[in-house]
């Protein structure tokens, strides 16, 4: 570790503590008294990673007070009531597309991506179908975590209505039919329950523009509920569920790969996409077809190569038993066979789903066709997508998403107030404890 990194923590804490002290003087000398601070933090993607890191940094400079179960900043009692985050992706420094990095540099390193134990309630909504190699996701080892169908931005938002021909109702793009509407409304509900000072749904409905942003089309609700009861992917640990749903998505990609009426290029969503999206989707389809074709040929060649080696071994064994030397030229494997031999086990497994025409539940196919976007097709790294970037084999759709699960620290035990420095016990602690009790207690 460099000297700069060794000094970074103390220097940062010194700077932030100095700012907190100046802020404390402002608070003390102001005629309006700040009795407590109740904090809610929200974030999506790298913003969710920053939200996690922000909470850790905040508690670096917070001081313990009262019974040792609370904290203050600038002499004011604070409570971090709610952390609402969508599909946490750090990718700090060299992203996951580099073989020498996991994207966990600087402020995303160590336990910084864990959920701080002083967060009263954490809710994390994670995407089931994202595959991009430079979008590894941090699960929430504590708090409440829910898995939602779709890609990264199908959960956290970001796709415009009608992007890639999705979210259409009666032939027209409809923002209330986006998959992201469901986790948005669910997060709003969880935040309100936790005491976050947001507008209620009743207040939102009184404003036509806000009401539109929080709308959820009956068609989406119907298809989403059908998927919930019909996907058949099973339960289990969240990392395993993500893999199970990835397999189902890859099977659907395979179903849409072959020529004929089932081809992706013949689907309504492709035909109603705009020209640029059609180019991206068609290019991704071509790259996927080439990958499957090359790996399928490599699998076939490798099987033939191994069969030839087995036959040679048999002939050599027969010659040995008969006391005769056997000279047989050793066959060479094709380049495709060598390439196939190097692929990860997960890629081989997912390839077989495509080659075997694995079935896809109808409810899942409806969701994939009409709502789930293709993040690999539309995400460019320079002038390339992950599917065709030179000299890097990511295996595109034939891979699982990277998932991290960092546990972090346990919440501290409460301490006897007499053991704490007097300066850390604000005289307005009683009011904050009463507020905490009203919100569900400490």
Kindly label every feature range from the protein language model.
Residues 1-442:
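Active-site- or binding-pocket-proximal scaffold segments within functional domains
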